[in-house]
C-alpha cells in the first residue's frame, strides 16, 4: 500500500471549459500559454502525457507525437475531451491522481502540466511521481502560479495584502489554490532530480484595463517578446519551466499501466475493467477511458 491520500482539487461535473475559458475573457491568457508551451515543447516524439489535461484545451499542440495520454482527475472532463478532439484515435484518456499515477516507471518521453501545480498541497510528492514516470533525460514542461509578480508586490508595498511576495514559502490564498515563489519551485525541482533548462515568464499583461481595451492577439504578441526574460527574472503571475529528468536509465519500460495502489504491473483485462493480480482491485475501462480514480471492486 502506498502513502496516505492527499487532498485533490476535483473538477468532476464542473463546466470548466465554459465557466473559465470560452467566452470568459481569457483569450489572451490562452494565446500566451500556447506560445510558451510551443516554444518549450520538443517538436516531435513517441509518447507524451499531459497531467491535468481537462477538456483537451492544449492537445492540438501535440500533433508531432505518435501517442498522447491525456490524464485528469475528473472523468467528466475527459468525456468532454473525447468530444472536443476530432482525431481521438491518437489519444489515450486516463482518469488518475497526480500523487498515485497509474503508469510504469520511465514510460514517457515528454510530460506537460499546465494550470495544475497551483492546486497541489504536496508539490514534492507530486514531482517525485512525475520523475518516476518520465524516462531518463526526458523533458518535463511545468507551469506554476507565481506569488512574486508585479501586482502582488505593489499590493504588499501598499499594505493591501498580508502575505509577503518575497517570502519563499507557498501561500494558499483560497482553499487548494496556491501561489509559489519561483526560487522555491526551482529548489523543489532540483531536489526531485529535475534540471531546469529554460524558464519563460508568461501573462505580463494580465491587467483588466489592457485586456478590455486591446485585442488579445496584440497582447499575446507582446507577451511572446517578453517571455524569454524569464531566464533572468520572473515577475509575472505565471511561469513556465522546461526541465530534464536527471536519472540513470533503467532500460525500456516494463509495460504501460500499473496499479496506482500497489504499483503492480500485472493487470489483466476482464470485460470492461483491468484487474490487478497483486491486490485484486478492479479498474474501470469502459467508454474509451481508463479510470484509475476509484476501483470498482476492492479485496
Locate the predicted segments by residue.
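A short glycine-rich, Lys/Arg-flanked "PGG" loop and its adjoining helix->strand segment in the class I
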Residues: 124-139
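A C-terminal cap/extension of S-adenosyl-L-methionine-dependent methyltransferases
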Residues: 159-162, 187, 198-271
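Conserved class I S-adenosyl-L-methionine
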Residues: 1-44, 57-58, 77, 139-164, 293-299
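Short catalytic micro-motifs in class I SAM-dependent methyltransferases
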Residues: 115-119
Amino acid at each position: 500500500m502506498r502513502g496516505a491520500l492527499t487532498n485533490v482539487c476535483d473538477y468532476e461535473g464542473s463546466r470548466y471549459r465554459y465557466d473559465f475559458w470560452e467566452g470568459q475573457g481569457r483569450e489572451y491568457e490562452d494565446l500566451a500559454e500556447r506560445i510558451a508551451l510551443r516554444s518549450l515543447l520538443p517538436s516531435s516524439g513517441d509518447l507524451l502525457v499531459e497531467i491535468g489535461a481537462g477538456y483537451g484545451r492544449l492537445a492540438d499542440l501535440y500533433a508531432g507525437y505518435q501517442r498522447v495520454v491525456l490524464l485528469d482527475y475528473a472523468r467528466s472532463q475527459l468525456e468532454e475531451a473525447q468530444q472536443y478532439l476530432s482525431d481521438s484515435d491518437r489519444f489515450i484518456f486516463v482518469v488518475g491522481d497526480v500523487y498515485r499515477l497509474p503508469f510504469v516507471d520511465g514510460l514517457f518521453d515528454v510530460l506537460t502540466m499546465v494550470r495544475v501545480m497551483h492546486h497541489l498541497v504536496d508539490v514534492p510528492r507530486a514531482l517525485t511521481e512525475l520523475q518516476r514516470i518520465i524516462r531518463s533525460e526526458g523533458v518535463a514542461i511545468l507551469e506554476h502560479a507565481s506569488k512574486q509578480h508585479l501586482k502582488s508586490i505593489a499590493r504588499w508595498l501598499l499594505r493591501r495584502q498580508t502575505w509577503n511576495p518575497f517570502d519563499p514559502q507557498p501561500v494558499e490564498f483560497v482553499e487548494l489554490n496556491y501561489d509559489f515563489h519561483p526560487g522555491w519551485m526551482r529548489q523543489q525541482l532540483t531536489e526531485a532530480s529535475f534540471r531546469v533548462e529554460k524558464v519563460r515568464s508568461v501573462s505580463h499583461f494580465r491587467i483588466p484595463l489592457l485586456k478590455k481595451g486591446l485585442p488579445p492577439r496584440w497582447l499575446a504578441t507582446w507577451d511572446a517578446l517578453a517571455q524569454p526574460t524569464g531566464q533572468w527574472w520572473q515577475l509575472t503571475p505565471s511561469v513556465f519551466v522546461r526541465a530534464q529528468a536527471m536519472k540513470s536509465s533503467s532500460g525500456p519500460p516494463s509495460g504501460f499501466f500499473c496499479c496506482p495502489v500497489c504499483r503492480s504491473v500485472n493487470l489483466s483485462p476482464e470485460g470492461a475493467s483491468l484487474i490487478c493480480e497483486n491486490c485484486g482491485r478492479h479498474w474501470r475501462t469502459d467508454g474509451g477511458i481508463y479510470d484509475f480514480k476509484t476501483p470498482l471492486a476492492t479485496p
